[in-house]
Amino acid sequence: MSWRGRSTYRPRPRRYVEPPEMIGPMRPEQFSDEVEPATPEEGEPATQRQDPAAAQEGEDEGASAGQGPKPEAHSQEQGHPQTGCECEDGPDGQEMDPPNPEEVKTPEEGEKQSQC
């Protein structure tokens, strides 16, 4: 390869940007979900805004108690049949086991294997 002239690369000078001035004290309620707002949102009574974790547990217990035992639908994705490609995470973020090698067809059998 031959040299065709001068390089056009020129490093840009570094710019110093001054940080913004602090206008006043930072209010933690703007940045944290743990701090309760001064006024409750519309449609929500103020008495139920105690602890989000405790409130969620109470809702879960009430919902499951009225419906009875749930079928074992957690082992598979709901509404999606298994395609034989279980290399993605499940609906709850837990990894699924790889398919059984005895059940998986090899490409030598005439079919293409799907890739994730």
UniProtKB/Swiss-Prot annotation:
Tissue specificity note: Expressed in a variety of tumor tissues but not in normal tissues, except testis.
Any coiled-coil ranges, and where?
A: none
InterPro entries in the record, alphabetically?
A: GAGE (IPR031320), GAGE_fam (IPR008625)
Identification of the protein by name: G antigen 2B/2C
Acidic residues bias locations? 31-44, 86-95
The species this protein belongs to is Homo sapiens (Human)
Miscellaneous comment as given in the Swiss-Prot or TrEMBL entry? This gene belongs to a family of genes organized in clustered repeats. They have a high degree of predicted sequence identity, but differ by scattered single nucleotide substitution. Their sequences contain either the antigenic peptide YYWPRPRRY or YRPRPRRY which is recognized by cytotoxic T-cells.
Where is composition skewed (Basic and acidic residues) in this entry? Answer: 102-116
Name the job this protein performs.
Antigen, recognized on melanoma by autologous cytolytic T-lymphocytes.
According to the record, the residues making up region (Disordered) are: 1-116
Protein family (similarity comment): Belongs to the GAGE family.
**Pfam families assigned:** GAGE (PF05831)
